């Protein structure tokens, strides 16, 4: 009995020591203060670290909204490393993943004198495929001379890289057309049959991850791993005792993608290309093979024409399949896949690549059949198209059951954190979408003095959003404010129409440097914005979050209207209908929470540091005229508020 009591107190003391270590790390005399220049203890940061520590101790989930400036990265890294547990850290973007692995994690490792192994793991599309490189060198590249120049740069970089991570090849643009030709996909990877298997960068990265104590991944890879494990056919990332999701607000939508199924024109074109490569290099006697691949490619191109529409379009597959031409076009693709399968079947065993292609054709055939059967309950059947490309998708309306099952079955610590999780003071929307139950919930306010540092303005006399002159009227309203601030402005739009229209208006009526999303890569736009004074960046979607511009370079953020998703979006319509059938209120239960999270992200672009000052303008009178406006305002930082543009200009001139 005495031995049992002693053992109990020994375990209790050991657990207490763990929390004490966390508290010491963040104290004024602690490890972080000693080792990290400029580190200052923050009460909110310590509270979060303690919550993560308790999640580790009791194997419970914790959900934390940590306002900008809280220091949430250190707040979860310290307890993770001190725990000694096998840890997976997942981020919403590859940019944050790289920053975490290359900057934040080494800082904490050094401060804590951490001796464990750490690893970075991305999806296979981020790594140079040696087999594809050999094929491109043998067959030639697709594209103009600039693509050839980029290939030369990749080949030179390949001689020195240790990881094969293409983001490290800084001599080529991140959107270079050579990159898709040099990476493998799940469909075309030869696996252990590949002649380059031993040197494969993906295999080596996964091996390091399996051996590491801390692995940094992203949500896409984590969800892909969940989907693979559900099938029982292996795993992409190792099991862990602690899983941390940063930028967790993105998780529900990303998880939906991976628990669904998709078929894209790119997949089909890649298939045709791979068939032609085999025909030209290994099986030159199979002339019929090349011709059949060309026929499949032509049928894919024809199908895109039958879909109709210009620019970026999204819609419901059920409605699309009402058109007989579209259904016939899909059947024609299926026929050509059957024809190719018959040809290849006679030559199985002659080429490992061809054998793999035969399997891929069978998988596409099954997927095509599923796409046509659009009646399965609980899923949204939808499509998207842009230019010559298209994608057909089957997406579950909710992942709460699948994700919630993971939480129940794995008795480990789960940490979900972001600057934007709660809506109107509650986490219900986020937790329900992921099936999170009985989690500790915590909101940590930003240490910034928003009342002094920032102004929130909903201007008076805003143009009616339903009238034809809205764009011009809004441009005229905003121009004096943007000019008074000499640019240094993000103009975040909720549609491509408004984005292009406002950019054109500013270019016509202003001497400021106007940068437009889509005219060059995201990183180059940000670089230009910072380097070229008096710039206005007009953007949508991808610039609402994950952008960190500090200091005087950015002191004005303008949002054209509340970011409600388009009511025509097929996924949203399906979620709303499902909500309605279950007795819910789609507007209050889905549309408002989604829009609040997005708005919080957009507003969060402004104040990134204690010395930042500036103005957020939201050009939507519904914030003050509709009852639901209070929900939005309650979720935003406590900035000083005004409707007077003269006060806005005066505040900016003080900056």
Located regions from the model:
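Conserved RecA-like ASCE P-loop NTPase motor core of nucleic-acid helicases/translocases
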Residues: 87-95, 415-417, 487-494, 617-619
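A contiguous, basic/glycine-rich beta-loop/short-helix subdomain that forms a polymer-engagement track
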Residues: 180-215, 226-233, 339-462, 469-476, ...
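Conserved RecA-like P-loop NTPase helicase motor core
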Residues: 459-469, 519-624
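Signature of the SF2 helicase/ATPase Hel1-core->accessory helical subdomain module
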Residues: 82, 98, 103-106, 186-188, ...
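Walker A/P-loop NTP-binding motif
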Residues: 53-54, 73-86, 103-107
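Conserved helicase motor "Helicase C" RecA-like lobe of SF1/SF2 P-loop NTPases
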Residues: 494-518
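A substrate-engagement module of RecA-like helicase motors
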Residues: 15-35, 85-213, 220, 275-276, ...
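Conserved pre-motif I regulatory segment
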Residues: 17-64
């Amino acid at each position: 009995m005495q031995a049992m009591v002693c053992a109990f107190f020994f375990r209790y003391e050991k657990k207490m020591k763990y929390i004490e270590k966390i508290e010491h790390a963040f104290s004024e005399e602690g490890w972080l203060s000693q080792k990290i220049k400029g580190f200052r203890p923050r009460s909110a940061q310590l509270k979060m670290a303690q919550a993560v520590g308790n999640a580790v101790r009791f194997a419970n989930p914790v959900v934390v909204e940590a306002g900008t400036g809280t220091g949430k990265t250190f707040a979860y890294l310290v307890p993770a490393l001190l725990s000694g547990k096998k840890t997976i850290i997942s981020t919403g973007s590859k940019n944050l993943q790289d920053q975490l692995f290359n900057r934040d994690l080494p800082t904490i490792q050094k401060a804590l004198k951490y001796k464990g192994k750490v690893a970075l793991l991305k999806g296979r599309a981020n790594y140079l495929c040696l087999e594809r490189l050999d094929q491109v060198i043998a067959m030639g590249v697709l594209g103009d001379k600039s693509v050839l120049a980029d290939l030369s740069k990749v080949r030179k970089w390949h001689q020195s890289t240790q990881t094969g991570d293409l983001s490290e090849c800084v001599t080529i643009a991140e959107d270079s057309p050579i990159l898709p030709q040099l990476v493998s996909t799940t469909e075309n990877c030869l696996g252990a049959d590949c002649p380059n298997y031993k040197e494969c960068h993906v295999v080596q990265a996964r091996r390091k991850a399996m051996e590491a104590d801390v692995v940094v991944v992203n949500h896409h890879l984590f969800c892909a791993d969940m989907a693979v494990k559900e099938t029982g056919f292996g795993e992409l990332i190792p099991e862990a005792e602690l899983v941390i999701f940063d930028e967790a607000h993105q998780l529900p939508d990303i998880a939906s993608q991976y628990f669904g199924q998709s078929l894209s024109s790119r997949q089909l074109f890649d298939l045709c290309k791979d068939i032609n490569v085999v025909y030209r290099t290994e099986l030159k006697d199979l002339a019929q093979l090349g011709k059949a691949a060309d026929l499949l490619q032509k049928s894919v191109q024809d199908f895109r024409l039958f879909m109709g529409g210009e620019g970026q379009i999204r819609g419901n597959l059920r409605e699309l399949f009402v058109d007989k031409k579209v259904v016939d076009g899909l059947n024609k693709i299926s026929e050509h896949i059957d024809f190719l399968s018959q040809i290849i079947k006679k030559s199985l065993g002659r080429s490992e690549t061809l054998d793999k292609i035969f399997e891929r054709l069978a998988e596409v055939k099954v997927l095509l059949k599923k796409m046509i059967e659009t009646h399965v309950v609980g899923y949204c059947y939808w499509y998207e198209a842009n230019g010559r490309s298209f994608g057909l998708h089957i997406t579950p309306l909710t992942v709460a059951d699948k994700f919630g099952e993971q939480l129940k079955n794995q008795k480990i610590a789960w940490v979900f954190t972001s600057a934007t999780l709660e809506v109107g003071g509650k986490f219900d929307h986020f937790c329900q979408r992921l099936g999170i139950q009985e989690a500790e919930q915590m909101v940590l306010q930003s240490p910034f003095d928003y009342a002094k540092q920032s102004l929130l303005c909903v201007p008076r006399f805003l143009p009616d959003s339903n009238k034809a002159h809205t764009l011009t009227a809004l441009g005229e309203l905003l121009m004096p404010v943007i000019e008074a601030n000499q640019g240094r402005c993000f103009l975040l739009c909720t549609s491509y129409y408004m984005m292009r229209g406002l950019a054109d208006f500013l270019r016509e009526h202003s001497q400021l440097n106007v940068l437009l999303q889509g005219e060059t890569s995201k990183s180059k736009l940000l670089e230009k914005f910072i380097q070229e004074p008096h710039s206005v960046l007009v953007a949508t979607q991808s610039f609402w979050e994950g952008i960190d511009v500090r200091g005087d370079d950015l002191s004005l953020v303008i949002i054209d209207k509340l970011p409600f998703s388009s009511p025509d979006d097929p996924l949203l319509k399906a979620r709303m209908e499902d909500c309605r059938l279950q007795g819910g209120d789609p507007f209050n239960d889905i549309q408002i929470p989604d829009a609040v999270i997005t708005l919080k992200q957009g507003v969060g672009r402004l104040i990134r540091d204690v010395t930042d000052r500036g103005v957020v303008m939201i050009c939507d009178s519904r914030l003050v005229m509709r009852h639901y406006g209070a929900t939005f305002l309650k979720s935003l930082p406590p900035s000083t508020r005004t409707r007077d543009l003269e006060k806005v200009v005066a505040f900016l001139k003080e900056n």
